[in-house]
């Protein structure tokens, strides 16, 4: 049954790729690691809001180092460091529930929606979206207006706030590192799938 074998091979490949991605998120070379729950929430919400999982993971790593209970000096809370007033607005706009922001099941969907909102607002410009995530939409809108930044702005050094410069730079760097490592894991999953199917075919007897 060639069709059935082909379909089984595809399902097995997809399963292996997903499994490798989860393992990669959990075990990548870093001083910080997400919990299994956070790793799963990254994948679910990246798919839900059409974000690269590497981008969502990079934002969480830079914002909180995966510390679900983190509270900053300005009152930003949880894995994605959401200010409660902003989180309430996000909940109202997105339809996601508002609750304990130290709960990643509440925090990450809100933060992921907001990240997608900012990417759309700035017409896909990741530098501007990340700058707004860190410094606020009002500041970024002011900079765009006063400094005549173009839609394809990418001069991170021109961002007035050093903290925001650092945030944007780190997120983009970590995202690219994660993407490269994920591609390696994906290739290994495909190779394992081919090897597994070949092994199965060898041991299949034709009656």
Predicted segments, located by residue:
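N-terminal Lys/Arg-rich, disordered targeting/topogenic segments
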Residues: 1-8
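Structural motif marking the loop-to-transmembrane transition
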Residues: 8-10, 126
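Hydrophobic membrane-insertion alpha-helices, especially the h-region
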Residues: 11-27
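Catalytic glycan-binding domains that act on GlcNAc-containing polysaccharides
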Residues: 24-198, 207
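A juxtamembrane structural motif centered on a specific transmembrane helix
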Residues: 203-205
